[in-house]
Design a protein with these regions (language model features):
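Core segments of cupin and vicinal oxygen chelate
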Residues: 8-10, 18-63
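Vicinal oxygen chelate
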Residues: 1-7, 12-21, 69-163
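Acetyl-CoA-dependent GNAT
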Residues: 62-65, 132
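Short histidine-centered beta-strand/loop micro-motifs
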Residues: 40-41, 70-73, 108-109
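Short beta-strand/turn micro-motifs at beta-sheet edges
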Residues: 2-5, 66-71
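Histidine-centered active-site/metal-ligand motif
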Residues: 15, 55-58, 80, 111
C-alpha cells in the first residue's frame, strides 16, 4: 500500500482505557496515590478519571477482566502508558509520594530529553511518569535524529527541586 496519507499534526491521543481486575483497588491507586480525580463512575464496573477536569484521560473497566490475573509479562499488549508532568518539581513531588507510600518503582531514568519514573499499577499495567526538558536543551545528531539515552536518574538532584 502506498503511503500518501499523513495523520493531521494536531492529532493527540485523548485517553487510554485499561482492563483491570478490581475497580476499587485501581481507583485507590490512580486517585488516592497518583492524584487523578473521578469524573464518571459506571456502577462498580468502570470509571473515567482525569487530571485537570478533562472528561477522562484514563478509563478503567472490569467488563472482561474482573478478578483475573494480570497479562503475562512476556506477551503482546501495551508496554506502558506515559503520564507527562508539567515540571521537574511535579515529578519530584510524585516521587516523594510514591516513596512515602512504599510503592515500588521498576525504574528511574534520565533520557537526556526527559526524566522518568517507571512503575506498574496493581494489575501490572506499566506506567511512565515523566517530565520533558525544554526543547532548547535537546540535542540532535548531524542527520537530525534526536539524541536520547537511558541513564540512571539522579534522584538527589530531582529531590533538590522541592527542598
Amino acid at each position: 500500500m502506498e503511503n500518501d496519507y499523513n495523520i493531521p499534526s494536531q492529532t493527540r491521543i485523548g485517553h487510554v482505557h485499561l482492563k483491570v481486575s478490581d475497580l476499587e483497588c485501581s481507583l485507590a491507586f490512580y486517585c488516592e496515590l497518583l492524584g487523578f480525580e473521578i469524573t464518571t463512575l459506571f456502577g462498580n464496573q468502570a470509571a473515567f478519571i482525569s487530571a485537570g477536569g478533562y472528561h477522562h484521560h484514563i478509563g478503567l473497566n472490569t467488563w472482561h477482566s474482573k478478578g483475573l490475573p494480570p497479562a503475562a509479562e512476556n506477551s503482546v499488549g501495551l508496554y506502558h502508558t506515559a503520564i507527562l508532568y508539567p515540571t521537574r518539581k511535579d515529578l519530584a513531588k510524585i516521587f516523594v509520594r510514591l516513596n512515602e507510600a512504599n510503592y515500588p518503582l521498576t525504574g528511574a531514568s534520565d533520557h537526556l530529553v526527559s526524566e522518568a519514573l517507571y512503575l506498574n499499577d496493581p494489575d501490572g499495567n506499566g506506567l511512565e511518569l515523566y517530565w520533558d526538558r525544554p526543547k532548547e536543551f535537546w540535542n540532535y545528531t548531524p542527520d537530525g535524529s534526536l539524541i536520547m539515552a537511558t541513564n540512571e536518574l539522579d534522584i538527589k538532584s530531582l529531590l533538590e527541586e522541592i527542598e
